[in-house]
């Protein structure tokens, strides 16, 4: 571990300790006492942040490694060869094939299947509550029944 990393670790430990020394204030007391405690807590927190900025700026000193070594490390980086792109262009037949996910979809206009009924479906499943209300002789009318009568 380099000295720069050690300094950075020491600074982080110091910041962690500073934040632990400023817990959120307790709740008992009158409203003005609680307000003053929160105000003092916030002011201490701002002071800790200012100290953290100063500590961080101290650790941003120039790196100890020479510029030649940094350039050498950059030169060692390589980019992997990418595979050649496909040369054939898509044809119109490629767009007409149906994806396998869509093969099992049943159109909504199929009256024999009520399994696929969802929110967007035209068909309407009746719940047991609706059927019991009709049996009790309620005055509510189903708009779909009105459409089928005409």
From Swiss-Prot:
The keyword Protein transport is annotated on this UniProt entry: no
Region annotated Disordered, chain positions: 20-41, 103-150
Domain of life: Viruses
GO molecular function: DNA-binding transcription factor activity; RNA binding
UniProt record, GO biological process: mRNA transport
Subcellular localization: Host nucleus, Host nucleolus; Host cytoplasm
One GO cellular component term: host cell cytoplasm
Annotated keywords: AIDS, Host cytoplasm, Host nucleus, mRNA transport, RNA-binding, Transport
Bias-annotated ranges (Polar residues): 20-33
Positions of short motif Nuclear export signal and binding to XPO1: 69-80
Region: Homomultimerization, residue numbers: 14-22
Name recorded for this polypeptide: Protein Rev
Species per Swiss-Prot/TrEMBL record: Human immunodeficiency virus type 2 subtype B (isolate UC1) (HIV-2)
